[in-house]
Amino acid sequence: MARIAGVNIPNHKHTVIGLTAIYGIGRSRARKICEATGIPTDKKVKDLTDPDQDALRKEIEKFLVEGDLRRETTMNIKRLMDLGCYRGVRHRKGLPLRGQRTRTNARTRKGPRKAGVALKK
């Protein structure tokens, strides 16, 4: 297994698909990285030579990936929450941020249903 950006890349997959195991690299960015390094996209990860792996590492270092990207994302959310703006309040309450309805639906963001209180007759 090739280890790039602190992540073990699966050996049996094509290079483009294997690079998507790194947080912050999707299919399109992986394809651009392969083009920039001159590595064929259909080449398997196990067939990469050491110079190929080094070239991939150098190209990936140019992007914000893994821990740094996660840290920046959480800091951005924390900043919104500290500001007390609408988006920050919605983050704090665990509700949708972008204007979706919440009377029904929004179950993913709100979590499982809570049991309602039944009134005595």
UniProtKB/Swiss-Prot annotation:
Region (Disordered) spans which residues? 94-121
One GO term of the biological process aspect: translation
Matches recorded under InterPro entries: Rbsml_uS13_C, Ribosomal_uS13, Ribosomal_uS13-like_H2TH, Ribosomal_uS13_bac-type, Ribosomal_uS13_CS
Keywords noted in UniProt? Ribonucleoprotein, Ribosomal protein, RNA-binding, rRNA-binding, tRNA-binding
User: What Gene3D superfamilies has UniProt attached to this entry?
Assistant: 1.10.8.50, 30s ribosomal protein s13, domain 2
PROSITE patterns found in the cross-reference section: RIBOSOMAL_S13_1, RIBOSOMAL_S13_2
GO CC entries: cytosol; small ribosomal subunit
- Which GO terms of the molecular function aspect are on file? rRNA binding; structural constituent of ribosome; tRNA binding
Top-rank taxon: Bacteria
The similarity annotation says: Belongs to the universal ribosomal protein uS13 family.
Q: What does this protein do?
A: Located at the top of the head of the 30S subunit, it contacts several helices of the 16S rRNA. In the 70S ribosome it contacts the 23S rRNA (bridge B1a) and protein L5 of the 50S subunit (bridge B1b), connecting the 2 subunits; these bridges are implicated in subunit movement. Contacts the tRNAs in the A and P-sites.
**Complexes and interactors:** Part of the 30S ribosomal subunit. Forms a loose heterodimer with protein S19. Forms two bridges to the 50S subunit in the 70S ribosome.
By its UniProt entry, which PANTHER family does this protein fall under?
30S RIBOSOMAL PROTEIN S13/40S RIBOSOMAL PROTEIN S18, SMALL RIBOSOMAL SUBUNIT PROTEIN US13M
What name does this protein carry? Small ribosomal subunit protein uS13
Look up and give the organism this protein is from: Ralstonia nicotianae (strain ATCC BAA-1114 / GMI1000) (Ralstonia solanacearum)
* Gene (UniProt): rpsM
